[in-house]
Amino acid sequence: MLLVRQLFGASANSWARALIIFVLAWIGLVYVFVVKLTNTQGQQAAGESELNARRISQALQMLEHTRQRNEELKQLIDELMSDQLDKQSAMKLVQRLENDALNPKLAPEVAGPEPESMFESAPADLRGWNNVAEGAPNDLEAGVPDHGEFEPSLEYEFTRRRIQTNIGEIWNFFSSELGKVRKAVAAGHASADLEESINQVLLQGAEHKRSLLSDMERMRQSDGYEAWRHKEARDLSDLVQRRLHHLQNPSDCQNARKLVCKLNKGCGYGCQLHHVVYCFIVAYATERTLILKSRGWRYHKGGWEEVFQPVSNSCHDAGTANTYNWPGKPNTQVLVLPIIDSLMPRPPYLPLAVPEDLAPRLKRLHGDPIVWWVGQFLKYLLRPQPTTRDFLTSGMRNLGWERPIVGVHVRRTDKVGTEAACHSVEEYMTYVEDYYRTLEVNGSTVARRIFLASDDAQVIEEARRKYPQYQIIGDPEVARMASVSTRYTDTALNGIILDIHLLSMSDHLVCTFSSQVCRVAYEIMQTMYPDAAHRFKSLDDIYYYGGQNAHNRRVVIAHKPRTHEDLQLRVGDLVSVAGNHWDGNSKGKNTRTNQGGLFPSFKVEEKVDTAKLPLYAGI
């Protein structure tokens, strides 16, 4: 077929040669038909009537197929003679002939399945609002599946997500710069007409951005890959959950290698969850059964197992073997792990790394693979006990929780002034309103509803007073119990568990990623959708994992410094990212030049770090 393609040049003289190729293709199809018909006639009739009937039917279908090709060739000749054939129509015919040659199973004698039938196990609700139902264990290997006609390529999925990210980045830039000009105008440095013009640019720019994002969402829903995304997400999640279950339930607990993790890290609930996830990642990487020491837990003295299901069904303690501190040796039976801040040496599989064997599939499926990876450990760890599940169900019912809904988390008290700046309620609600206007870009009207969680009860009361047009779901009593003086109680624990649960089930998150509670909710959210990487707005930090290894991004567009604050970037450079200023620029350090500074966010792409981890063969 390469020869056929080469014959289609700009020269009109190539049509005669092209015609010869098409006639040869037609002769080949007739030859196949004759051979099949001859073979059919050579069979003995006795006892084979049914088989012969099927073969005759196949031959007739092939004859019809050949007749259609004959008609197309005849039409082609007529168009050639009248100089009415353009190159595009010719190439379409070439493509059809090529597909028939490369995919004989798609010929009329065997009708292929409809695209939908290939994904019978996909959930009916493809909007991503509901969690994917648990399916039966799948034996799909962790390697990259051959993506065929009904699966997207890595490049397609990567490009789609990159466009979505950069739509937001370009708006960050223009809104920030025009906002500065507007402030200058308001201060009396320009006329009122100019101020009004700038306001119109901002308003129309925001509407244009919402339209683009709405189009992107429509493209995702209609590109034909949504069923694949749900199936692939379910298959990958099932694979990881089976591996974790296998790791945590060894056949011989007494002689199994173990990793001891002590729950009582001196920090809040979200921080402690991340501590347990870090322990679990190390256990997974070293093929050690995780032993969680939780008796006397500051949030619940009875321990983890009274709130969530045990991390193991059969192996609950370290046994009588001697224990050794990290790093120990490969044959050390019981290893005690310190907190991530004091871990030395630091292994390469710490966040932000994902398993090498899963990485090709994850990069194709998800916009931020490390968040998905962390979410899988939380999915296993946070399986509720029946009493906890009943509490969550009744809590949702009592609050009147329903979709669509935006989850808003406002962190105050001990974080403000030390680890994070104070953000007004208006800042959060600006992005909430923008989300709902994006939903309404097609002219529909959507009920405005938010779930508001905070450690300051006054925040909920303030929001209800300032935004009466919103249905604001939240419990001021839970917020009061989350204050520093009362947060380490059973009541406060129930409140924070409910808050995180409802935040994670929201359609969109508005919060500060400096808060571990917000990051935990975002991580759990990834288990609710095939890809929820873009379902958030952080008012401060980008996503990070406390104690992580370097967060690098790769330069894809060169950058010449515009000011003394800018970095010089070459294509291929790695930039260690410190944060996003949400004005179109990010801050980081060029690892090639070792210089720090600002750079346009759209000129880099995420570099997904991988680490060689156990394959858990046969699981």
UniProtKB/Swiss-Prot annotation:
Required cofactor names: Mn(2+); Mg(2+)
Cofactor info, note text: May also use Ca(2+). The enzyme has substantial activity without divalent cations.
Any one GO cellular component localisation term in the record: Golgi cisterna membrane
Residue ranges of domain GT23 in the record: 255-539
The organism's place on the tree of life at top rank: Eukaryota
Pfam entry (one): FUT8_N_cat
Location of the motif SH3-binding: 345-351
Subcellular location: Golgi apparatus, Golgi stack membrane
Lumenal topological segments: 39-619
GO molecular function: alpha-(1->6)-fucosyltransferase activity; glycoprotein 6-alpha-L-fucosyltransferase activity; metal ion binding
Keyword Transmembrane helix annotated: yes
Membrane topology note: Single-pass type II membrane protein
PANTHER family: ALPHA- 1,6 -FUCOSYLTRANSFERASE, ALPHA-(1,6)-FUCOSYLTRANSFERASE
Family per record: Belongs to the glycosyltransferase 23 family.
Name recorded for this polypeptide: Alpha-(1,6)-fucosyltransferase
Annotated gene: FucT6
